[in-house]
Amino acid sequence: RLEYRHTNEAKCEGVARELANVISEEIISLGMKETDFIGPVPCYTRKLYGRFRWQIILRGPNPVPLLQGLPLRGWIVEVDPPNLL
């Protein structure tokens, strides 16, 4: 799970959508046919401690090659999250 937080909701959503576009392109260019993603969508608890939260859920057997090429500065990366709430 990739999660982005920001005090401005439009900025948070925009950054999440930009990364989703990059992920889509990278999955195709790396030939990762078994990897897909859900999102970006707001987290279940959309706002926490004054910051809006958006997430992208990656699903696949080995997302490491994909993650290595992504611009993840400011993102929280959670491997095998115990829940998605």
Where on the chain are the PLM-derived regions?
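Accessory helical-bundle/CTD segments and flexible terminal tails appended to RecA-like ATPase motors
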Residues: R1-L85
